[in-house]
Amino acid sequence: MPTLPNNITHPGRLLLDRRRFFGETVSSLGSIALLQLLHSQNLIADEQAWTPQVPPTAPHAPRTGLLQAKARNVLVVFCAGACSQLETWDYKPELIRLDGQPMPGGPPVTFQGPAGNLARPQYRFRPRGQSGKMVSDMLPHLGALVDDFAFVHTLTSKTNTHGPAENFLSTGFVQDGFPSIGAWVTWALGTENQNLPAFVAIPDPRGIPQASVNNWGAGFLPAVFQGTSFSASQPIRNLHPPISTSAAADNSARSLLQMLNEQQLRQNPLDSELAARIASYELAARMQTSVPRITDLSSESSHTLSMYGADDPSDPIRAGYARNCILARRLIEQGVRFVQLFNGAYASAGKLNWDGHQALREQYDVHGRIMDQPTAALIRDLKQRGLLEDTLVVWCTEFGRMPMFQKGAFGRDHNPQGFTAVLTGAGIRPGVSYGQTDEIGFKAVQDVSSVHDLNATILHLLGLDHTRLTFRHNGVARRLTDVHGHILQPILA
């Protein structure tokens, strides 16, 4: 039997060893056969993946999905800090009866210190509308609209920490670095208005939420699809040139830059990043006139300002949020595809957001007044103008709160096991309540749903299949809903 030459290195001997060669060859052929089998049975996600065709020179051009769309635009009202379901939408008479008693079965695992006893809802609930839906006295204006709403009472989250939970709600993942739902939507569908951003995030007058730009970031999608953040009182930074730069000089510089970019693009026609950069510069130039116009509310009638509460000098935070609500309506009116409207700011022991750990009733008296009338006026205004026919409105928060007070305090701890989202507008069946939490509002027990289900439903109403909308990143087929998510059919019209 011939032997291997002595001067072959050890790695070379391994490569020339016949047993090793045939063994690894057979293993590789088996892997190829398995791959073909999985493809033939549609068990590999890429087989069903759908990627939109995005023109490099017009990344925001309007596009259509694979399904028939019920909604054209989306408006998300996001209450940062975890607004309590027990003080808003989820009526629990048994919690009233058990007020002051220990938690049945012993205290649960909590986020911030030991748990105290069960605590009744801090507001009275009353039947509202023709449906008689029980809604808290904290929300009289929104409560009057319940016949137009669909309630999902059994949302669950993967985490009880604010930042990761905001990430999960907005991106489908608790980690940083994933695209927000608004970025996914605008990547897939573009926008109707080419003079305004396709995706706008409107921060609360008190500041930005804890997960910050993750809520409107593009993640690994092209950066052109990230949200643009501005409000009625704080327009886009650096929108205009410095005072020292004349209009003529600014126009000349812009023209020169455009000429150089276009010359470079002609030499490199396949450079999609350069094409996207040119498109972004052109949009920025158009925004110099369109954004000041859209944020100037002087053309709004006194009746409209009063309806929203935007003319109330006694409460500048509420008036500021009301003006943001008017801005949101104006953006939807102009065809902006996706609008995020934030109510509440960074973690502040509940003083600037809905994180009511210590003094829930005292703080919610403030937050409820800020949020209720302006948000209800926004929904009414959209409906009166016929905009709800093709606009989906979603009210949500990152998780719920516990049915007991924290020990030694008058507030509730974090609870990701059952909380409420409210939907209205395009494609939504009005007047329905989906799912139930247990008798004290501690956890979802019937028709349990997840944030993935909510996001899958939003995509479905826009004509997008959450199981197929896919972007390959680092060799992985990524989706907003990962490998999860079901459409919430019972709330759809």
PLM feature segments, named:
Residues 1-493:
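Ligand-binding pockets and gating/stacking loops
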